[in-house]
């Protein structure tokens, strides 16, 4: 992701100044010429540079994805420094350079104009930045009438019908990187070829430093709605067909075990409906308890025996919130992702006991909605004032994971 960010900064520099940046990978960190020096904690020469600048190393390494950015006089010459606590932090620091040059993160998607410059004057400064929320991203949902036809008919002609491929996802992931987002739930309706079925998509996510996840009805990184009819056998039913369901999940986990994934745990129906095979709340709670245990055993076997190292999320959406409130016990290291009511009003915020969970809390929030009892899409999106109010409520209630 650092190399990707360097490429983007080079592109932005050319757009602003009409000139190219000269990239040098050098053992000699400092020279007499003007420089933008970029490194990451743990890389050769980084420690000596951190000491030279008088930075406390733990101020960068304590927080994931942090970065140090400065314009500073060192040895009689003004230089700019970008030092990341990790690779994503370095990339975000580089993207901040683009913002300082006057390049909007929306320069491509919104045709935000880039004002040309002959020179760039920056006063001396230094700052350390890190995210307030650990995982930040978007869900590409309800793509049937917008994203998919736009990609197929306009931006990426020649792809098979319903395919969102690496060319389209590269533009989406670039925007996320520029906005310092690190997470994406890919498009998953029946009209769309599932994300992992398209060659190059997974590699594109890794190129831009994006954790791939999946929605409330897509456990274990499988697009159940699009993939069960292709790879599943029998009914998607954990009561009566659990071995086939586990085989279905296992195939994907084996495939992506080395990929940055946030695993959604639990189970609903094939697409945004109640689970099959369990009718009452008590029955559903019993099934979900077993599902969670089996999923975590699979992750421990195939990904990492130390489950705390694997990002996992449980999403009490719609009827699943009733199951949770009936007494479902979710392992402590799993993030609980709370939800709005589909219209922008959060249904539940963690109480004082829930806030003690080591897995922390997150939020699944609708900017638009396609479903019962009433759709609101495109221009009539959730009002920004309501979004501000509700997102701040969530943040203040420790929904920060």
Where do the model's predicted regions map?
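The substrate-binding groove and active-site-proximal loops of carbohydrate-active enzymes
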Residues: 81-84, 141-166, 182-192, 227-245, ...
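Gly/Pro-rich turn-and-neighbor structural signature
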Residues: 23-25, 114-121, 189, 196-197, ...
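Structured mid-domain segments that build the active-site/substrate or prosthetic-cofactor binding neighborhood
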Residues: 182-185, 192, 200, 216, ...
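Conserved, mostly hydrophobic/aromatic
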Residues: 13, 86, 138, 180, ...
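Hydrophobic or amphipathic alpha-helical targeting/insertion segments
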Residues: 42-43, 74-113, 195-222, 226-255
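Catalytic domains of carbohydrate-active enzymes, especially glycoside hydrolases
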Residues: 161-189, 200, 204-213, 258, ...
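An acidic-aromatic substrate-binding cleft motif
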Residues: 106-161, 167-187, 359-362
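Contiguous, structured surface segment used for ligand recognition
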Residues: 1-130
């Amino acid at each position: 992701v650092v190399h990707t960010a360097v490429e983007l900064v080079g592109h932005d520099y050319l757009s602003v100044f009409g000139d190219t940046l000269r990239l040098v990978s050098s053992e000699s960190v400092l020279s007499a010429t003007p420089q933008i020096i970029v490194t990451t904690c743990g890389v050769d020469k980084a420690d000596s540079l951190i000491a030279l600048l008088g930075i406390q190393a733990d101020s960068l390494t304590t927080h994931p994805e942090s970065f140090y950015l400065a314009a500073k006089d060192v040895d009689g010459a003004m230089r700019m420094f970008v030092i990341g606590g990790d690779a994503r932090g370095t990339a975000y620091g580089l993207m901040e350079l683009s913002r300082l040059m006057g390049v909007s993160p929306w320069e491509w998607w919104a045709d935000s104009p880039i004002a040309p410059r002959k020179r760039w004057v920056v006063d001396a400064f230094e700052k350390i930045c890190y995210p307030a929320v650990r995982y930040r991203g978007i869900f590409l949902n309800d793509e049937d009438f917008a994203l998919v036809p736009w990609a197929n008919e306009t931006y990426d002609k020649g792809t098979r019908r319903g395919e969102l491929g690496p060319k389209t996802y590269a533009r989406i992931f670039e925007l996320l990187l520029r906005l310092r987002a690190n997470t994406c739930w890919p498009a998953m309706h029946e009209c769309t070829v599932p994300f992992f079925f398209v060659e190059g998509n997974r590699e594109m996510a890794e190129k831009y430093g994006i954790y791939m996840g999946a929605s409330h009805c897509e456990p274990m990184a499988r697009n159940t709605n699009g993939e069960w009819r292709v790879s599943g056998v029998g009914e998607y039913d954990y009561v009566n067909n659990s071995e086939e369901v586990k085989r279905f999940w296992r195939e994907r986990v084996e495939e992506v075990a080395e990929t940055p994934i946030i695993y959604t745990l639990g189970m609903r129906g094939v697409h945004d409906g109640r689970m099959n095979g369990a009718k009452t709340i008590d029955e559903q709670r019993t099934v979900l308890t077993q599902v969670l245990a089996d999923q975590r055993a699979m992750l421990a076997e195939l990904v990492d025996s130390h489950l705390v190292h694997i990002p996992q999320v449980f999403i009490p959406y719609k009827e699943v919130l009733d199951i949770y409130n009936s007494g479902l016990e979710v392992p402590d290291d799993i993030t609980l992702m709370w939800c709005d009511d589909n219209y922008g009003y959060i249904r539940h915020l963690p109480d004082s006991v829930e806030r003690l969970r080591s897995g922390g809390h997150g939020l699944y929030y609708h900017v638009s909605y396609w479903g019962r009892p009433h759709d609101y899409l495109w221009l009539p999106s959730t009002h920004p004032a309501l979004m501000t109010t509700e997102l701040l409520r969530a943040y203040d209630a420790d929904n920060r994971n």
